[in-house]
Amino acid sequence: MAAKQPPPLMKKHSQTDLVSRLKTRKILGVGGEDDDGEVHRSKISQVLGNEIKFAVREPLGLRVWQFLSAMLFSSVAIMALALPDQLYDAVFDGAEVTSKTPIRLYGGALLSISLIMWNALYTAEKVIIRWTLLTEACYFGVQSLVVTATLAETGLMSLGTLLLLASRLLFVIVSIYYYYQVGRKPKKV
């Protein structure tokens, strides 16, 4: 009883069979575009992601601006907490302080914002950097409106307060500029 030999198996060359390769890539989910329009070359890059996508392309001078902002917020906060009379006098040029409590509360709020600014200086996360820049722009914008309204009520106008307003508006512009620069999508390489 001779056992009959099975016919030799035909090996399929899937590397050369384009339809088979396409089906395999489709099953693996490789080669198609993701939500951001990126085409992944391998399953590993699809699972792990493309690290370029997560890297923040920092605009020139961003970290210097963050450092200066954190220093400004900290120094004004400390001055408002420790020397409320002098801070009020510097802003409103000779007007009398009726109560130190609101100025000290302002200093406490500024100190809290400055802690956020200091922490944002050491992060690489785009969202955190953008939120701190937006917070800064909103703060300076609101401060400009409050100082303008106070000057309109009191009628006190001096060179110091005009310089303060001009500097605050400049800070708003710079913060918004960096906010949009950090939010830009990186160019495909």
UniProtKB/Swiss-Prot annotation:
Principal place of residence: membrane
Topology relative to the membrane: Multi-pass membrane protein
Chain coiled-coil ranges: none
Residues passing through the membrane, by range: 64-84, 109-129, 131-151, 156-176
Classification via InterPro entries: TP53I11
Keyword Membrane: yes
Phosphoserine sites (modified residues): 14
Cytoplasmic side: 1-63, 130, 177-189
Record-level GO cellular component terms: membrane
Protein location: Membrane
Top-level taxon: Eukaryota
Keywords for the protein's UniProt record, in alphabetical order: Membrane, Phosphoprotein, Transmembrane, Transmembrane helix
Extracellular membrane side: 85-108, 152-155
Pfam families in the cross-refs: p53-inducible11
Entry protein name: Tumor protein p53-inducible protein 11
